[in-house]
Amino acid sequence: DIALFAQMGFKVYRMSICWSRIYTNPEDKVPNEKGIEFYLNVLKELKKYDIEPLVTLSHYDVPVALINKYRGWYGRECIDLFIKYARTCFEHFGKYVKYWLTFNEVDAMLRHLVTSGGLIEDQFDDVPFEQAMYQAMHHQMVASALAVKIGHEICPDSQIGCMMTKLCFYPFTCKPEDNLATQQRMRSVYRYVDIQVFGEYPIYLKKEIDNKGFEVHFEKDDEEILKEGTVDFVSFSYYMTSCWAASTEGLELSPGNTFNGVKNPYLPSSEWGWQTDASGLRYSLVELYDRFRKPLFIVENGLGARDVVSEDGKVHDPYREDYLKEHVCAMSDAINLDGVNLIGYTWWGCIDLISESTREMSKRYGFIYVDIDDYGNGTYNRIKKDSFEFYKKVIASNGTEL
């Protein structure tokens, strides 16, 4: 697969390291040498082809041992264990890795409770479950800040960023209440990245927690840790947009990336209801850069579609080429017209893989077709889609030949 990425001309490849591959039990004193060897082999292969790795330390894979013993990230013990793991990664892989992300879609704690936070509601009969979510998120914020600080100490030339789900909502109407509701909704998208960029809880998040009657426990050094561990860049996933309204009564909803919104009558929808919107990417880039004044990195963007192998043995996917073309143009405008500092882009998928949003193989994203069905049956052979050659041309021309 890496050789195929090199054929496309990849300059960067996003990957993640599985915590449990490095420490089979997070409380082990010594890392798993076979796990370290596995990732070293991957990184060396990327280096052979001059592909820069972008490495995520935690991507929806909280070790089960932490869920069982500490109730996931609700237990503060997870901070020290994560830092031990992160330190091991920096020490063993730092020679090959310049760009790091601490947590994938860090805002996902309140959506993907188990995979992102290791939180199981049945384990919490002594504290309101929602309060436990805020506390778990605080522990991840502290862990992220400590990882940034330690990463810079071990790998002085490294760039360590955060990663968020870039949900984008337009007000459904120009009614003031719809605009206010949308503003409040977008605040909830940014609240945790605000901490990672500015090094402190935003006032609106403090008020949100207070107004719910919850208390998030801080240790005495937490505020200083957050201040000292701000990120170098902001990365995000972007797929589509939706609308938002103060009331959805009588309105048609559309599914989206983890959240439903109000359907936008001006946008096309995929088979799965996601409303594709290249202008929304430019809008998001400007919004993010104006807010954070940090370099931006798009680390997930793509189109899920039901690809078919034709009688000629090929996969013709002009719809993916069109999606890519439109989004590259949006990035170009954000850079050249709006002055956004966009430092990188990675397509979601590269090869076909199981769709996280629908749990199926049929929703395919890759430039490379993988012969597997929804039940794991198939030859696992790879086929270059038409979009493979198209993306190769995009990379070679730095987006000028579309």
Where are these regions (language model features)?
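Catalytic domains of carbohydrate-active enzymes, especially glycoside hydrolases
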Residues: D1-C18, E228-V234
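General structural concept
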Residues: R14-M15, G35-F38
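Glycine-rich, proline-tolerant flexible connector loops at the mouths of alpha/beta enzymes
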Residues: I17-P31
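Active-site region of glycoside hydrolase catalytic domains
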Residues: N25-E27, E37-L402
